[in-house]
Regions:
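Active-site and ligand/interface coordination hotspots across diverse enzymes
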Residues: 1-48
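Short, glycine/serine-rich, charged loops/turns that create anion-binding
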Residues: 38-40, 73, 114
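Membrane-helix interface/capping segments
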Residues: 43-46, 78-85
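Residues at alpha-helix caps and immediate loop-helix transition turns in enzyme cores, especially N-
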Residues: 46, 50, 119-121
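Short catalytic helix/loop segments, enriched in acidic residues and glycine
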Residues: 49-59
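Short connector loops at secondary-structure junctions
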Residues: 64-80
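Glycine/proline-rich loop-helix segments at beta-alpha junctions forming the active-site rim
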Residues: 82-162
Length: 162
């Protein structure tokens, strides 16, 4: 990808990443990925495996920009940390999610099975009640699947609000 730009928004203390974005020439619109929690991808353009797959999909689907927000803004590659932390959500996370959603051409939910932790998936669905949501499929429990191990042939479908 030529002309690739990147960045992220962090809390002052560095414990939370509120958003991550990648921008490239070509395409149109912004896809917003809502996942579980930030791992190792950063503002310098370094991708972890999940962000790499999201970026490839976003380009293939014709978007010009992708942004990633998370149910939990706490930076950790381990979902277990979300259960143990006093505040895994982060004080500015809901405002960040709502602001990013307001600018998105498509919102793709992809937090996987752990999204039900602390009732967080339901809170975010309520926060975005007026927005059309999409996913790449759902788990047996009805949560949107995480994109890491899904085939690239999967395309976004409407995500219900059951």
């Amino acid at each position: 990808m030529s002309d690739r730009r990147f960045g992220a928004s962090y809390s002052d203390c560095g414990l939370y990443r509120y958003s991550l974005w990648r921008d490239w020439s070509g395409g149109d619109g912004t896809i917003l990925w809502i996942m579980l929690n930030p791992s190792r991808a950063d503002h310098l353009g370094n991708n972890d495996p999940t962000i790499e797959r999201c970026e490839r999909r976003s380009v293939a689907w014709g978007f010009r920009r992708m942004e990633v927000v998370n149910l939990f803004a706490l930076r950790s590659p381990y979902p277990k940390a979300l259960r143990e932390a006093d505040d895994p959500i982060g004080p500015l996370n809901d405002a960040g999610i709502a602001g990013s959603a307001a600018q998105a051409s498509m919102i793709l939910c992809a937090w996987g099975a752990h999204g039900t932790l602390r009732g967080r998936a339901g809170e975010v669905r309520t926060l975005l009640a007026d927005k059309p949501l999409h996913c790449l499929g759902t788990t047996l429990a009805g949560e949107p699947t995480h994109p890491l191990y899904l085939p690239y042939g999967r395309v976004p479908v409407p995500y219900g609000r059951e």
